[in-house]
Design a protein with these regions (language model features):
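Positively charged n-region of N-terminal signal peptides that target proteins for export
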Residues: 1-5
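A short, structured surface patch at a secondary-structure boundary
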Residues: 57-112, 116-123, 128, 223
Length: 300
C-alpha cells in the first residue's frame, strides 16, 4: 500500500509535487552550436531559443507524459534519459532513468549532455528545474491545467523541435475528438459519480481535481463537489448517503476484484462500476481521448 501511495502522490497530475506558487525559473542559455530551425517561447520567460536539427537533438524527459509527447512527435530516438514510470510506448522502458519521485539525478543528466530537457511545471521539483537551467541547460517547462492545454503544449514543443507539422496534426485531432465528446454530453444536468483509486483509505476527488475535469467532459461531476480539498478521504456511509450515478474506479485491478468491495452494499447502492486505466487518466497524454470515450460511455 505504501508503494501505491508513493506512485499516486508523486506521478499523478491529480496531485503535484510542487505548490501552485512554486514556479521554476526557466530562463535558459542559447543552445550551443545549434542550427536555427525553429523557436518557441519557454514558460515563465520571454527568452526564445533555437533548436538544432531534430535528428541530432538529445532530449531528456522528466515526466512520463512528456516522454509520450516526444514519441508522438517522432522524437523517441532522440530521448537519452527519462523519468521513472515512462512506460509508454514500449520502447520508453529501455531508456536510461534520470528522475524519480525524489527528484532529478542532476549528475546523470549533465553527463548525458542533453540539448533539451522536458520538465513538468507542477510535477518536477522547482529547485531541480532551477538548478538545471542555472547550469546553462535548456529547459522546456510545460504546465497543463486544463485538458485543452495538452494540445497547445504539444504544439509549443513541436515548434521548438522542428516537428511543427506533426504537432499541429496531433493537436487538431485531439481537440476535434475532445470537442465531439463535449458536444455529445453538453447541456444536461451533471451526473454525480464516485471517482476513486483505492479503498484503504477510501479517497475520492474534489471539484478542482484533474479527475473532475475529465468527468465534466462526460456531463458528470464528483460526488463531493462541496469538498474543500482536492482529494478527500470519505467513508462508505458518505457514498451511500449521496447515491452516485456511477462508481468510477481508476485501477489496474479486475472488475471481480473491485466489485468485492461494493458487494455487501448492493442492497443500498445500484450504481454501475466503471473501470478506467489510471496510467492514462492520470497523465496529460494524447491517449486520454480514447479513455475518455470509455469513461463517458460508462457514465451515460
Amino acid at each position: 500500500m505504501k508503494t501505491l501511495l508513493v506512485v499516486f502522490f508523486c506521478y499523478l497530475p491529480l496531485l503535484t509535487l510542487a505548490g501552485e506558487d512554486a514556479v521554476p525559473d526557466t530562463e535558459t542559455m542559447p543552445l550551443a552550436n545549434s542550427v536555427p530551425f525553429a523557436t518557441a517561447q519557454l514558460a515563465s520567460t520571454s527568452t526564445s531559443i533555437s533548436s538544432p536539427n531534430p535528428a541530432e537533438l538529445k532530449i531528456i524527459s522528466l515526466a512520463p507524459h512528456l516522454t509520450e509527447w516526444a514519441f508522438s512527435l517522432g522524437l523517441g530516438p532522440n530521448l537519452v534519459g527519462v523519468s521513472d514510470y515512462s512506460d509508454y510506448p514500449e520502447a520508453a522502458k529501455n531508456i536510461q532513468r534520470v528522475a524519480d519521485f525524489q527528484g532529478a539525478d542532476i549528475a546523470a543528466i549533465v553527463a548525458l549532455e542533453p540539448d533539451l530537457i522536458l520538465a513538468w511545471d507542477g510535477g518536477n521539483k522547482p529547485q531541480d528545474i532551477h538548478k538545471l537551467s542555472s547550469m546553462g541547460l535548456n529547459v522546456f517547462s510545460s504546465k497543463v491545467e486544463n485538458i485543452t492545454d495538452i494540445a497547445s503544449e504539444i504544439k509549443r514543443l513541436g515548434a521548438l523541435t522542428s516537428t511543427q507539422k506533426k504537432a499541429t496534426q496531433l493537436s487538431n485531432d485531439f481537440l476535434t475528438d475532445l470537442n465531439t465528446l463535449k458536444n455529445k454530453y453538453d447541456g444536461r444536468p451533471l451526473k454525480p459519480v464516485f471517482y476513486y483509486s483505492w479503498t484503504a483509505p477510501l479517497m475520492t476527488i474534489g471539484p478542482n481535481a484533474w479527475g473532475n475535469k475529465l468527468l465534466s467532459i462526460c456531463g458528470a461531476q464528483t460526488l463531493f463537489p462541496d469538498s474543500p480539498v482536492d482529494y478527500p478521504q470519505v467513508s462508505i456511509k458518505d457514498v451511500l448517503v449521496r447515491q452516485p450515478h456511477a462508481l468510477i474506479a481508476a485501477s489496474k485491478n479486475s472488475y471481480q476484484e473491485l466489485d468485492v468491495f461494493w458487494r455487501e452494499h448492493r442492497n443500498f447502492l445500484d450504481a454501475p462500476l466503471v473501470i478506467v486505466d489510471p496510467d492514462v487518466t492520470s497523465r496529460f497524454s494524447l491517449r486520454l481521448i480514447n479513455e475518455l470515450k470509455s469513461l463517458c460511455e460508462g457514465i451515460k
